[in-house]
Regions:
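Phosphate-handling DNA/RNA-contact segment within nucleic-acid enzymes
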Residues: 1-79
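TOPRIM fold recognition
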Residues: 37, 53-143
Length: 143
């Protein structure tokens, strides 16, 4: 699977490969409904796709960093939003990225990682949730 970024490069993923076809940059997915005052920020595309699967994106625009090193590239795109929801990894790099965004945007930034407390990221949360649901379904059918 390949996802286009703002510089014309692609973030590529398969079972065997995770990388970028340069140039590397962020990816912006605009809401199809109406112009949005909210942008949700994700570290990678798998977290973004997990958010879509979980139904947490609503009518917000979504910005995928494709690397926390791209936080400065994201800044100019985020300037126009009144609310910025961050679904970043629950690790040191994710915390540094959240801190950098909060320093620039103040109260407009909201940490949304409490949704997946106990997991490294949103994708891990989705995998655990899906696995639990499958196990519960099997238990119900066995009774």
């Amino acid at each position: 699977v390949g996802f286009l970024n703002m510089a014309g490069g692609y973030e590529a993923r398969s079972r065997f490969f995770k990388g970028c076809i340069p140039p590397k940059s962020v990816s912006l997915v605009k809401s199809e409904d109406t112009p949005s005052n909210e942008c949700l920020v994700f570290e990678g595309f798998m977290d973004f796709l997990s958010a879509v699967t979980l139904g947490v994106t609503g009518n917000a625009d979504c910005l995928v960093l494709n690397s926390v090193a791209n936080v400065e590239k994201a800044a100019e795109l985020l300037d126009g939003y009144g609310r910025i929801g961050c679904f970043l990894d629950r690790d040191e790099a994710g915390r540094r990225t959240l801190d950098a965004l909060a320093k620039r945007y103040g109260a407009r930034v909201a940490d949304r990682s409490s949704l997946y407390d106990g997991c490294k990221d949103l994708n891990e949360y989705l995998q655990r949730t899906t696995k639990k649901q499958k196990n519960n379904h099997l238990k119900i059918e066995e009774q």
